[in-house]
A protein has these predicted regions:
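Bacterial N-terminal signal peptides
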Residues: 9-20
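Structural preference for beta-rich elements and adjacent junctions enriched in aromatics
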Residues: 24-273
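Serine/threonine-rich, low-complexity intrinsically disordered segments
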Residues: 4-6, 18, 253, 266
Length: 273
């Protein structure tokens, strides 16, 4: 190839690549709906009437967003029970990336947890003093369910919680809606630090949002590892007795629950939009 042809080829390749990048960058983001109304996070989809749902899995999983000047509200509707996987045990993680790179460097895990009375009292004391009389009444209960959130670092590990008196907490609730399960989330737009819950982008700004749930829980992983060790030991014993160790090893540990994850590019609404 001559030098002239080489330059023409390189220029054409650069033009094609530039067009592809421009097309990718120009992909239309999903618009969040602006709201001036006070939103009650209760897991009820009726509060979202008039706001269109976007399908991730047709007839399976849908989602929607709206925001005011301080808060992003997200709705996740799992219509087909097969997509729930182990969501009750794993909870739902929302990832936010204001750079649009779909990075999992920052996430918030939302999960319903059961606390014994002492753990629940400790949780309440993070928000303010609890009288001895109230503690005595709480200790009479068997336990408490808490719709809990934890900020996760780039390794997916919980960070040290910021006092709720110093930062607005994220909130979520979920409820059945016929055969579907409805998850509703509220996250402050402002993120004071990577220890606090927040989207990290303001009204009118773009942000990539990721949803993730399901898969193996830590208990499942430990149980599977234990079963594999037991099978390996039994197979070795079977081999020592002159039997066929493959009979033991072929039993397996059963199917692994699926983990579901997807991202969307979101354009936060601003007043008057």
């Amino acid at each position: 190839m001559t030098r002239t042809h080489l330059r023409l080829f390189a220029a054409s390749a650069a033009l094609i690549l530039g067009s592809a990048v421009a097309a990718g960058a120009g992909q239309e983001a999903l618009p969040s709906a602006w709201t001036d109304q006070t939103v009650v996070v209760d897991g009820l989809s009726k509060d979202w009437q008039g706001i269109p749902l976007t399908d991730w899995k047709k007839d399976g999983v849908s989602y929607a967003f709206r925001n005011d000047g301080e808060t992003l509200y997200a709705l996740l509707v799992i219509k087909d029970p097969k997509y729930r996987s182990t969501i009750e045990a794993t909870g739902v993680t929302l990832y936010f990336d204001a750079k649009g790179a779909k990075s999992k460097d920052y996430g918030i895990l939302f999960k319903k947890v059961r606390l014994d009375p002492e753990a629940y009292i400790a949780h309440l004391e993070k928000q303010g003093p609890v009288s001895e009389e109230d503690k005595a009444e709480l200790r009479k209960k068997a336990g408490f369910y808490l719709y809990h959130h934890q900020v996760l670092d780039h390794k997916g590990k919980p960070v040290e919680a910021v006092s709720e008196a110093l930062a607005r907490p994220a909130v979520f609730k979920y409820a059945p809606d016929g055969p579907a399960a409805v998850y509703e989330f509220s996250v402050p737009l402002l993120r004071g630090s990577d220890l606090a819950a927040g989207v990290g982008a303001g009204p009118g700004a773009p942000v990539a949002v990721g949803f993730e749930w399901g898969g193996q829980t830590e208990e499942m992983k430990k149980a599977a590892a234990k079963k594999q060790r037991e099978q390996a030991n039994f197979a070795n014993e079977e081999a020592d007795r002159g039997g066929d160790p493959q009979i033991v090893r072929s039993t397996g540990t059963g199917p692994t629950p699926k983990k579901y994850s997807f991202w969307t590019s979101l354009a936060l609404a601003k007043s008057g939009s």
